[in-house]
């Protein structure tokens, strides 16, 4: 019989239970605040590891991008097919101040608009806003039947598509260049630009389901705390000193 180590006796230490530590004890919660251009500013909560040593929690939070449904921000189910991206730019206590970072459509909404017997027209432009944000905006539109039309389809010719795409690009460029990022966001929510495109292209070919389907942020200017505070409705009031009345200097006779 070979003499050696008994493997069964050496298994005792492996069966010891390890101390279970709840990972959430090392984390803390922060409230996400949307800009004042939206009706509901309370987006939700996010967590991050607590500040320890040289690692600061605010450094891990800055630049974090969250995706929110526009229906939750506006309190209306009419905007349920839009997704808005918000970027954390500043940490104030337990509040995270965000800025607009982009917008997109849900996949089911896009697929529901694509149908037979019509032409899909897409256009995109890269423009800089008046406050130096570089955006790439994608627009989508579909043709519809003309009044008293007998034909089943409403296909547009290539010349019509080029003319419509040119008009859409011109309108998008003009609206973005003459607006700040906050003003542009307020125009995208009620779809003001869509109605302008529909009126401008009705002489070329009648359109329907015109939407700015996507907004992508390509470049942003240098971070300005004052502009972010104004966007969140904070720090807009000027702090002015008041004139003091009834004050007399006291002269001491002896020092």
Curated annotation (Swiss-Prot):
One of its GO terms (cellular component) is 90S preribosome. It is found in: Cytoplasm. It comes from the Eukaryota. It holds the Pfam family Ribosomal_S3Ae. The modification N-acetylalanine is found at residue 2. Keywords: Acetylation, Cytoplasm, Isopeptide bond, Phosphoprotein, Ribonucleoprotein, Ribosomal protein, Ubl conjugation. InterPro entries: Ribosomal_eS1 (IPR001593), Ribosomal_eS1_CS (IPR018281), Ribosomal_eS1_euk (IPR027500). Coiled coil: none annotated. GO terms for molecular function: structural constituent of ribosome. GO terms for biological process: cytoplasmic translation; maturation of SSU-rRNA from tricistronic rRNA transcript (SSU-rRNA, 5.8S rRNA, LSU-rRNA). The keyword Ribonucleoprotein applies. The modification Phosphoserine is found at residue 245. There is a cross-link at residue 248 (Glycyl lysine isopeptide (Lys-Gly) (interchain with G-Cter in ubiquitin)). The modification Phosphothreonine is found at residue 254. N-terminally acetylated by acetyltransferase NatA. SMART domains: Ribosomal_S3Ae. Present with 107000 molecules/cell in log phase SD medium. There are 2 genes for eS1 in yeast. Belongs to the eukaryotic ribosomal protein eS1 family. Component of the ribosome, a large ribonucleoprotein complex responsible for the synthesis of proteins in the cell. The small ribosomal subunit (SSU) binds messenger RNAs (mRNAs) and translates the encoded message by selecting cognate aminoacyl-transfer RNA (tRNA) molecules. The large subunit (LSU) contains the ribosomal catalytic site termed the peptidyl transferase center (PTC), which catalyzes the formation of peptide bonds, thereby polymerizing the amino acids delivered by tRNAs into a polypeptide chain. Component of the small ribosomal subunit (SSU). Mature yeast ribosomes consist of a small (40S) and a large (60S) subunit. The 40S small subunit contains 1 molecule of ribosomal RNA (18S rRNA) and 33 different proteins (encoded by 57 genes). The large 60S subunit contains 3 rRNA molecules (25S, 5.8S and 5S rRNA) and 46 different proteins (encoded by 81 genes). eS1 interacts directly with uS11 and eS26, which form part of the mRNA exit tunnel. This is Small ribosomal subunit protein eS1B. It comes from Saccharomyces cerevisiae (strain ATCC 204508 / S288c) (Baker's yeast). The lineage of its organism: Eukaryota, Fungi, Dikarya, Ascomycota, Saccharomycotina. The gene is RPS1B.
């Amino acid at each position: 019989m070979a003499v050696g180590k008994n493997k069964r006796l050496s298994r005792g230490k492996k069966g010891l239970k390890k101390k279970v530590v709840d990972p959430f004890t090392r984390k803390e919660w922060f409230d996400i605040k949307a800009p004042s251009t939206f009706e509901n500013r309370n987006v939700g909560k996010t967590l991050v590891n607590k500040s320890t040593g040289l690692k600061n929690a605010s450094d891990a939070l800055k630049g974090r991008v969250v995706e929110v449904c526009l229906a939750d921000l506006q309190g209306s189910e009419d905007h349920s097919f839009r997704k808005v991206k918000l970027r954390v730019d500043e940490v104030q206590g337990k509040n995270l101040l965000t800025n607009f970072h982009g917008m997109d459509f849900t996949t089911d909404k896009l697929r529901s608009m694509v149908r037979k017997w019509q032409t899909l027209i897409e256009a995109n432009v890269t423009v800089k806003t008046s406050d130096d944000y570089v955006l790439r905006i994608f627009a989508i539109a579909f043709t519809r039947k003309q009044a008293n039309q007998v034909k089943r389809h409403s296909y547009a010719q290539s010349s019509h598509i080029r003319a419509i795409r040119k008009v859409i690009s011109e309108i998008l460029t003009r609206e973005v260049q003459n607006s700040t990022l906050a003003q542009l966001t307020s125009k995208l929510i009620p779809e003001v630009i869509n109605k302008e495109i529909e009126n401008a292209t009705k002489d070329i070919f009648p359109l329907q389901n015109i939407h700015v389907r996507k907004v992508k942020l390509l470049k942003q200017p240098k971070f300005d705390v004052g502009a972010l505070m104004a966007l969140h409705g904070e720090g807009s009031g000027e702090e002015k000193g008041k004139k003091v009345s009834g004050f007399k200097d006291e002269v001491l006779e002896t020092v």
